[in-house]
């Protein structure tokens, strides 16, 4: 039996809500978390596609490095510091971006994220919960809250427009020892589905990216146990997907009007197995829990 595409599993809504023309070529784009990893890869690829890119990151030096990389390659780019967990920062990002573009953005990518894991529920420090949810969930909430009205109000000449929210296969995988991260990404998935429904019939497309392991620095910069960090590093090497490839696949999916983007085979398999055989999936995850958690 062939694997089902995410839109087929959940019905035709994924495509019906999003059908439009290309958004990622020549975009006026705002990318959060653009200082490294998938965010930097998004910025570089958008620059290659002729876009002007606002590279935003809480690490201002990293944001400037990405922007400099783009300008060296002939693209237009600027760096702006932004802590996405703070709505005032996101409002300032929107204001500065529009001033630099001299127009409303045509594409917003809510990518900034952090990682935490390695302990079961009840042992994860509440400060870690607040930190992860503050960046991973409240960041996209702030981004959608601030930028959606701006995209709605943009002139028709600026259509099509789009929002890409970066979630993770953790949104549906329920991997043990990663509760805070899982919950944050499940929230981003639901946020994206709701936003797509609300924007149905407009020129604004929504795509949610749900990758598995990608070669980024999220393990080094996160609050993750030594055992879990070693496992994650091994899986990142095994997946074979670079951040650049994930960014390209996601931007192409967005141009097609796909609501869901699961770039890797293991993400697609996990998506399908959980929906076609949820009991089997949960038992398998339980076995993994007994072998990976202390």
Task: Indicate where each model-derived feature is located.
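Substrate-binding pocket helix/loop in short-chain dehydrogenase/reductase
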Residues: 119-121, 125-130
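Active-site helix of classical SDR
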Residues: 144, 184
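Residue(s) in the substrate-gating loop at a strand-loop-helix junction
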Residues: 168
